[in-house]
């Protein structure tokens, strides 16, 4: 069975780029009757917070992503210790005592000599006495994984290609000789991303790893680690990254692009799903009404190979399109939560939905209709016309035909036409020069409010 995973770090709110990875994995699992694993990468105990774990869970639920299994890396340290010890015993994980400053100096020297800034494995030359000396100075080792890029002598590396058939990008090749041995364990004993990730992928029988293409180099290292652990390799797929319109990478520090924030702002769940999945693919970003329809058009191979820019304006447009098609029954509960209720609520929704970007925006129109309003006065030259319009307002309750009858009469009596006729009335009654059809608004306002507002604006 196909098994995929989404492994967020609960160190902040996840953004649209993160959720794009989650959706690609979720839809891929759905399309192949597979399983979706949620794995919290919370090995950084100090920065990982329960509030972010809760927020990630809430975001996934809102986006209709339902994990089949949930794991926490912080509960698996014993397993990582076991694997690390085995690698140490085999000489594949070795201690290094250089400080960050010393390593930085070496890199600068290598670059000045036009050499690649690859770690030279100097730690492998240390004698037991030298290691003891470092320990006596209070230095604690960090541990590097010995990449298999040599024949007999690890100090003499040779070109060693790691290849895989990426399900998105096709054949990929990484030369392990061009990479430094990765640090798997920090000085303090905490684990970096690589070892826990590979161990979990093995233990959880992950068959497909679908992630951003910023992990391509990591994949070469991880394949070497999979092989060192005598494990079957998963299938890899790397999708293009999203950036801001300025070309900057998305970050958890950009809270306005977090799913938590976008949800609070009133964006539709399916709008974010469609946008995240279809942007940067060969398909148009279409406003599918639900996830099942989106799934039918999901294809991992449609992903572009170039970076894609995320423009919030495009998400607004997509959201608007979806909101305009929502029926009253679909939003009835949400409107009630916004205190939009009563016998006129359905008529109200049908009147205004084409003029809002988000369901929450309906509140502005509801208040415009029901609350006492203080609008900017109409233009001085239009006030006599507004006063005059009162004389020709149809008698009795206002209905579907009232606006047409009223404006037809005004056209005949005043000679006004087009904007000169309609705009002063709209501004007098709503305070705006745009909005829903006035015929529908007239009914919602009711005769008494129409008379009151025209009287005030005609003064």
Swiss-Prot record:
EC numbers for this chain: 6.1.1.17
Transmembrane segment boundaries: none
SUPFAM superfamilies xref list: An anticodon-binding domain of class I aminoacyl-tRNA synthetases, Nucleotidylyl transferase
Keywords, in A-Z order: Aminoacyl-tRNA synthetase, ATP-binding, Cytoplasm, Ligase, Nucleotide-binding, Protein biosynthesis
Cellular location(s): Cytoplasm
Residue window of motif 'KMSKS' region: 249-253
One Pfam family, short name: Anticodon_2
Catalytic activity: tRNA(Glu) + L-glutamate + ATP = L-glutamyl-tRNA(Glu) + AMP + diphosphate
Chain residues that bind ATP: 252
Domain of life: Bacteria
Single Gene Ontology BP annotation: glutamyl-tRNA aminoacylation
GO cellular component, one term: cytoplasm
Primary location recorded for the protein, binned into one broad class: cytoplasm
Keyword Membrane: no
Motif 'HIGH' region, chain ranges: 8-18
Protein family according to the UniProt entry: Belongs to the class-I aminoacyl-tRNA synthetase family. Glutamate--tRNA ligase type 1 subfamily.
NCBIfam families: gltX_bact
Protein purpose: Catalyzes the attachment of glutamate to tRNA(Glu) in a two-step reaction: glutamate is first activated by ATP to form Glu-AMP and then transferred to the acceptor end of tRNA(Glu).
Protein name: Glutamate--tRNA ligase 1
